[in-house]
């Protein structure tokens, strides 16, 4: 498996054997890839902080006729030009990187930041789940509530309480979905991307 984008190809990679343990969005950094904090510091292995995945070297000049987006993605930090597409991650003591997700999709629930991809990958480890999408639903108390749209494996049923408990076994309680919606498909495109806007609308229509 590889981590990258059109703005930053070959950022990181992982290898999984048939007998290997399944892990959620974990990679080894490529030689030109670092995890940088918002103020430009390099994140050190074992740090409790999170940062943005950044690639240096042969990176694109920018986006066609979009200087604002180009300036945001392609940044010069301490004299080095970096491509920073917006993926947030943490890094273990052994250097393993755990991808959290895109900052643009981050859900703020009760003042805590939750990255949808992190919860989605964990949900997909449950034996009843084929695929999952996580969005922010309205919540009077927390502002946004973690809402999961889940596609079941053939012959399996989606049980909301089971999936919520499953996530709480792996993560802090605030990252667990408040609601779980069973769907026929999450509509993941061939490139692996999800239409979060459309999925949010589905969640709102279902819950209201």
Predicted segments — roles?
Residues 4, 57, 61-65, 69-76, ...:
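AMP-binding/adenylate-forming catalytic core of the ANL superfamily
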Residues 201-208:
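Acidic/polar alpha-helix N-cap and adjacent early helical turns
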Residues 180-183:
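General small-molecule cofactor/ligand-binding pocket signal
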Residues 1-22, 27-34, 44-45, 59:
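Gly/Ser/Thr-rich phosphate-binding loop
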Residues 26, 46-48, 141-143:
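Short coil/turn motifs at beta-sheet boundaries
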Residues 30, 80, 129:
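Short coil/loop residues immediately preceding or within conserved phosphate-binding loops
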Residues 34-56, 93-94, 156-160, 195:
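Conserved beta-loop-beta connector loops within the AMP-binding
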